Amino acid sequence: MKIAATIARYLLGAVFLFFGSNMFLHFLPMPPLPPGPMRQFTEAMATSHYAYGVAFFQVAPAILLLVNRYVPLALALLAPVIVNICLFHITMAPGGLPQAVLVVVLWFLAVHPVRSAFAGLLKQRA
């Protein structure tokens, strides 16, 4: 399980570093967007520069995962990003849902060895 978790951590870090840095460097061409809510959402994210904040919270934790430092913090920072990726694909682009599910699986595999770091968050009472 330790090897699987390490591989998952590196893959998760690589995925978020690659796609997060694409927002800053634009090395992947964007396909034309279909009309409708997905287009409006993507245009709003781009024109408001909100996407740069999201990209930062992809790249910074990705680097932490790849260098194996502050791994629980990196995983905690990626959790809301992953939830939003899943919600986006469930509601607007179901074709990308398998990739989103893969990211969720990688996240859970990476969390497993450091789950004790999150134990305090799951206490019913203080």
Please tell me what each predicted stretch does.
Residues 1-27, 52, 67-126:
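Extended, low-polarity transmembrane helix blocks
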Residues 61-67:
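Conserved interaction-surface patches within small, structured recognition/assembly domains
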